[in-house]
Regions:
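Mixed-charge (Asp/Glu-Lys/Arg
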Residues: 1-132
Length: 132
């Protein structure tokens, strides 16, 4: 019976090791995932920018709780938590400055997603109205 326990222990160790490797592969960032030039970011699609933003956030200690659906997202693309704070994030990869509408949308998304904070992340600038 002792031999069977050793074999079972080794089998459990191997399965746990394989699971950890898989989990690291899925969750861990590779430097190339977030190592982009501004020109490369400007060429991304909106969805690519959302995924890139999520990768950068994850690499900086944020927990990605949800990537919202492409339409009907109530004004948030990513829901994250950081140090016990839940945050709604609106990603805007624009060629022009981001207007006040994006800010209003993500603020309204805070309530829908039960968040304490809201952020708009962009590759551009904000209009004066959006900054106020």
């Amino acid at each position: 019976m002792h031999k069977e326990q050793v074999i079972l222990g080794i089998l459990i160790f191997i399965i746990a090791w394989m699971f950890c490797r898989w989990l690291l592969k899925v969750m861990q960032l590779k430097p190339k995932d977030t190592d982009r030039t501004l020109e490369e970011i400007d060429q991304m699609t909106g969805k690519e920018f959302e995924l890139f933003t999520a990768a950068v956030l994850r690499g900086n200690g944020f927990i990605i709780e949800e990537m919202t659906k492409d339409t009907g997202d109530y004004g948030a693309d990513i829901i994250v938590s950081f140090q016990d704070t839940r945050i709604a994030i609106q990603c805007k990869r624009y060629k022009k400055p981001v207007g006040v509408k994006a800010v209003q949308e993500v603020i309204s998304a805070m309530k829908h997603y039960d968040c304490e904070e809201a952020i708009v992340i962009t590759n551009n600038y904000f209009t004066r109205q959006a900054e106020i």
